[in-house]
C-alpha cells in the first residue's frame, strides 16, 4: 500500500510538471553564421538586427570593464532583475529554472510579460545564458499584459582579460500587440543601449 501511494504521488507530480510546461523554442545555435545584418548603431555599443527563423532577431554588443564572473552573477540573478533592468517591474520565480517577467512599457503602450525557461553553459572560451518562452499553469495570460509568447534570448560573455569582458545579448525583437511596426527599430536601439548601461550601472 505504501509503495502504491508513493508511486501514485510520484506519477502525479511528474504529470503536473509535464502539463505545466510547454516549450516554444527559438534556437540561436546558428545565429553567428548569419551574414546579413541591418546595423542600427555602430559605436561603443553596437546594435543590429536580422530576420532569423522567421523572427526579427536583435543583438547588442559592447566591451565592459568588468570580469566575466561579476557580469554573469548579475545576469543569472533573475529574482533581482527589477533592481537592475529598469523596465522590469516584477519577476516571479515559478521553478528553479523558470521565471515570469513583467515589463512596463512607455507612454500609451500596453505592458508586456513573458514566461521563460533558462539554462547556463560555460566553456573555456565563453559563458552563455539562454532562455525560451514556455507556458506555465502558475502564470496564465493576464489581460493587463501582452504576453510575448515567442520570447527568446542569449547572453554570451567572452573574457578579453581578467577585468574586461565582451558582452553580447541577442533577443527576439517581436513585441506583438499594439506596438507600431514603424517604431520597432527605435525600440530595439533603446533596448540595446539600456541593457548594456544597466549591466554597467549594477557593477559600478
Indicate residue ranges for each PLM-predicted region.
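N-terminal signal peptide c-region/cleavage motif recognized by signal peptidases
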Residues: 18-19
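Hydrophobic pocket/interface hotspot
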Residues: 71-72, 81, 118, 167-169
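A short acidic/glycine-rich loop-to-helix N-cap element
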Residues: 140-147, 173-194
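Hydrophobic-ligand binding "helix-grip"
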Residues: 25-26, 37-39, 113-161
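Short beta-strand segments that buttress and anchor functional surface loops
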Residues: 48-49, 99-106, 131-133
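Mid-length scaffold segments of soluble, non-membrane domains
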Residues: 77-116, 120-122
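Hydrophobic ligand-binding cavity/cleft-lining segments
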Residues: 23-96
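Bacterial N-terminal signal peptides that target proteins for export
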Residues: 2-13
